[in-house]
């Protein structure tokens, strides 16, 4: 039994009263709000029964947590609404449906213990509802905001808008609109607890604006999604319409016919077991896909790549050795070593039907025919030829391809090239293998290790295909200018064949038999229009080219042919032009290079050395001057560390032999020495100029000239020994081009003379030296009234040396 201690007309003040409590889940009931509630908990049903037994009033308060089935005092908000029970209906499942109307706000002052239901002591809450301009402005703003909100929320119908428009009381307006808004429970509870009408309207206005922004954002998102869906549905509808029309007209479905064609190709194509299984699995997936999907295009391209590769297709090798020799000789003059290696391969293949393809590396200067020789090898073997330039390649994916997960992924260049050539046993030329570089994307030379390893390349795995592909029958030929630029692991997998520069006679033969005819044809001339005599070809070779190969020679011949073509057009097709030196100079300009000896006369302090470069051999003049000073030594010419150390070793040797060479032993205290190696802008390095520097220094200090028609090469030790060097063939060819008569080489390089053409050795005198004494005897032009060596002081000099460093000779030999 409870009793209201204040009359109904008093809905504010501090009077307390008691009544049953009905805890609510996920709903806040505002005053003047009529709402149906479903009540199922025993305590809540008992509270309704108690209220119905008295004056049908009950206190409605929201739970802080809706999931709590048995709420305690701390689980219920203190502010709620006193409501009138309008109607009650008991349902068959035991729950009760009750219709209530909110009356006024109240706050729980205390809970009254009761075993059957919640019973609370309440105090009514007084609202501040003073009419003011601010409240009127807020009322209009809230009503306008609610109207704007209703345009975005279709659940707010016109009937609700009319009901809201009819409310004049500001407090009731705020409560009614708050009841219709889908605010969170805590937001509605705060609005219920806000007694000041102006403040409540202000909070309500802000919340309505937030809801409008949320709905506008949702509409934009829905619009984008709907547009995309409409586009997809439209495309699907149009595709279906197209199929229906094609069916009516008796035409085949493009996608279906494409699948049928793919299926036929899969059945016809001979694939490896792994590739066949992969293709069947991918084709099965493709049949289940929409033809317009991006994934279908990716799968279709993948299957097409696999089917386009020559898994077992190959060309038949021509095993006629005589015919192969004829073709190789027809295409290239000289180059005996690589030709011999190809003939050996063909001979072995004739005896052993299946052998692994060799991996050759042609190393030589530009223009000597490395790439064209690879093409000629393919013609001689009756194989297809493919060339891949590796110059500047710095991405591993260029070799291995990209994985299919990337957009626009493709296989690497190896697989692409094999698809293009349509056979799995081509001659594959990897050009400029020494020009590759690496960066953050990987090292392409590391990816080539598998390609060029005969023990691994039968199962080369491209990232795009993700299948093992057999490269073992491919004849790989790589080309390089500099062997030292190739990483050692890669170099170890290849058979190195050095191709040296051409001699003057080789160039003459190549020019006469190959280049003249080629350029005449390229420029529309017949051999009757122009006459290249051997003398004129030699003149062009000597005065307009300075190279190991014949690329510049061909360029100069082409330039002459173009000039002659102009004359033929002017004078008529019967024109014939005989080349002379004057005419060559008219066509090509003044000679670019001086042909002849490095120096015209014997000079003091000037010795001619020989150098090796990537472009062939070259001569190297080394100059030394001696000036009064305090022993300063200056070495110039952009020299590397090794060459500077070689100069220091040469100087130390000269100091140790000063008396024997007739040089003042104190020269290093009284004179400054300057050693210079032209051309100053070109970097130079290496130890092979050691004896040349020593000869130049001795000549400058002893004031004895050095032969101008003699060149030398060799590394020097502190004891004067001459050590072997590399690149001998290129160096002797350079000496021959410079018309030098004599070349001094280390005795240990005698074995390399077999690589020098006999005709060169007939025209140039090669002398072997093993000590600086031998070099000086042969190189110095000693006047008749002077001696080069002062033998009487040799013993004393030797004694001085051993005093400075006791029995070092034996120790040096032991090392």
UniProtKB/Swiss-Prot annotation:
Gene3D superfamilies: 1.10.8.60, 1.20.5.5270, 1.20.58.1480, 3.30.230.10, LON domain-like (2.30.130.40), P-loop containing nucleotide triphosphate hydrolases (3.40.50.300). Its main location: cytoplasm. Induction: By heat shock. The keyword Nucleotide-binding applies. GO terms for molecular function: ATP binding; ATP hydrolysis activity; ATP-dependent peptidase activity; sequence-specific DNA binding; serine-type endopeptidase activity. Residues 601-782 form the Lon proteolytic domain. Keywords: ATP-binding, Cytoplasm, Hydrolase, Nucleotide-binding, Protease, Serine protease, Stress response. GO terms for biological process: cellular response to heat; protein quality control for misfolded or incompletely synthesized proteins. This is Lon protease 1. It comes from Syntrophobacter fumaroxidans (strain DSM 10017 / MPOB). The gene is lon1.
């Amino acid at each position: 039994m409870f009793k209201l201690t204040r009359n109904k007309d008093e809905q504010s003040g501090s009077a307390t009263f008691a009544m049953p409590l009905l805890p609510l889940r996920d709903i806040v009931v505002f005053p003047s709000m009529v709402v149906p509630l479903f009540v199922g908990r025993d305590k809540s049903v008992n509270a309704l029964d108690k209220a119905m037994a008295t004056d049908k009033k009950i206190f409605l308060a929201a739970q802080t947590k809706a999931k709590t089935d048995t709420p305690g005092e701390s689980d219920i908000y203190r502010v709620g609404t006193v409501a009138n029970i309008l109607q009650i209906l008991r349902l068959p499942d035991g729950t009760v449906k009750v219709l209530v109307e909110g009356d006024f706000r109240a706050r729980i002052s205390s809970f009254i213990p009761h075993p059957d239901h919640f019973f609370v002591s309440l105090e009514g809450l007084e609202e501040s509802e003073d009419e003011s301009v601010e409240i009127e402005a807020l009322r209009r703003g809230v009503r306008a905001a609610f109207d704007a909100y209703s345009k975005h929320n279709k659940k707010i119908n016109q009937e609700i808008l009319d009901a809201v428009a009819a409310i004049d009381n500001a407090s009731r307006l705020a409560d009614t609109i708050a009841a219709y808004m889908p605010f969170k429970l805590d937001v509605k509870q705060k609005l219920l607890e806000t007694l000041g009408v102006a403040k409540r309207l202000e909070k309500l206005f802000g919340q309505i604006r937030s809801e409008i922004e949320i709905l506008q954002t949702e509409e934009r998102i829905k619009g984008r999604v709907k547009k995309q869906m409409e586009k997809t549905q439209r495309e699907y509808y149009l595709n279906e319409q197209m199929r229906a029309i094609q069916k009516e007209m008796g035409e085949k479905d493009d996608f279906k016919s494409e699948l049928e064609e793919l299926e036929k190709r899969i059945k016809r194509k001979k694939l490896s077991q792994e590739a066949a299984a992969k293709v069947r699995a991918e084709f099965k997936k493709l049949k289940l896909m929409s033809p317009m999907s991006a994934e279908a295009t990716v799968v279709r391209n993948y299957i097409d790549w696999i089917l386009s590769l020559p898994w077992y297709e190959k060309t038949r090798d021509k095993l006629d050795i005589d015919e192969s020799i004829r073709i190789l000789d027809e295409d290239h003059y000289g180059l005996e070593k690589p030709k011999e290696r190809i003939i050996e391969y063909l001979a072995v293949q004739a005896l052993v039907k299946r052998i692994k393809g060799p991996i050759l590396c042609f190393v030589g200067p530009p223009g000597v025919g490395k790439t064209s020789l690879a093409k000629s090898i393919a013609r001689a073997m009756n194989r297809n030829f493919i060339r891949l330039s590796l110059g500047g390649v710095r991405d591993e994916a260029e070799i291995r391809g990209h994985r299919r997960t990337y957009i626009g992924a493709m296989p690497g260049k190896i697989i692409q090239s094999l698809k293009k050539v349509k056979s799995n046993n081509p001659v594959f030329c990897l050009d400029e293998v020494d020009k590759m570089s690496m960066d953050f994307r990987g090292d392409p030379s590391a990816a080539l290790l598998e390609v060029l390893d005969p023990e691994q390349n039968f199962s080369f795995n491209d990232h795009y295909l993700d299948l093992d592909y057999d490269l073992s029958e491919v004849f790989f030929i790589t080309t390089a200018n500099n062997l030292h630029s190739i990483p050692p692991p890669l170099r170890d997998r290849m058979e190195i064949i050095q191709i040296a520069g051409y001699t003057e006679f080789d160039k003459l033969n190549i020019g006469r038999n190959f280049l003249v005819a080629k350029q005449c044809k390229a420029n529309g001339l017949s051999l009757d229009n122009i006459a290249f005599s051997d003398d004129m070809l030699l003149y062009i070779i000597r005065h307009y080219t300075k190279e190991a190969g014949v690329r510049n020679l061909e360029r100069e011949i082409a330039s002459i042919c173009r000039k002659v073509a102009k004359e033929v057009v002017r004078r008529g097709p019967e024109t014939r032009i005989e080349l002379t030196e004057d005419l060559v100079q008219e066509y090509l300009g003044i000679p670019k290079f001086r042909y002849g000896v490095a120096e015209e006369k014997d000079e003091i302090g000037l010795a001619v050395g020989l150098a090796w470069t990537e472009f062939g051999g070259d001569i190297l003049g080394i100059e030394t001057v001696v000036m009064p000073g305090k022993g300063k030594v200056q070495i110039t010419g952009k020299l590397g560390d090794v060459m500077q150390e070689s100069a220091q070793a040469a100087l130390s040797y000269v100091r140790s032999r000063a008396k024997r060479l007739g040089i003042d032993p104190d020269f290093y205290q009284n004179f400054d020495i300057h050693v210079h190696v032209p051309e100053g802008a070109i970097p130079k390095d290496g130890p092979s100029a050691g004896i040349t520097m020593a000869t130049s220094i001795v000549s400058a200090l002893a004031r004895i000239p050095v032969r101008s028609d003699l060149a030398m090469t060799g590394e020097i030790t502190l004891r004067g020994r001459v050590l072997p060097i590399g690149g001998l063939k290129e160096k002797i060819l350079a000496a021959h081009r410079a018309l030098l008569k004599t070349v001094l080489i280390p005795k240990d390089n005698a074995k390399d003379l077999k690589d020098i053409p006999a005709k060169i050795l007939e025209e140039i005198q090669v002398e072997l030296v093993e000590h600086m004494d031998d070099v000086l005897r042969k190189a110095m032009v000693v006047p008749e009234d002077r001696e080069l060596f002062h033998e009487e002081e040799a013993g004393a000099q030797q004694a001085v040396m051993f005093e400075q460093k006791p029995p070092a000779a034996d120790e040096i030999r032991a090392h």
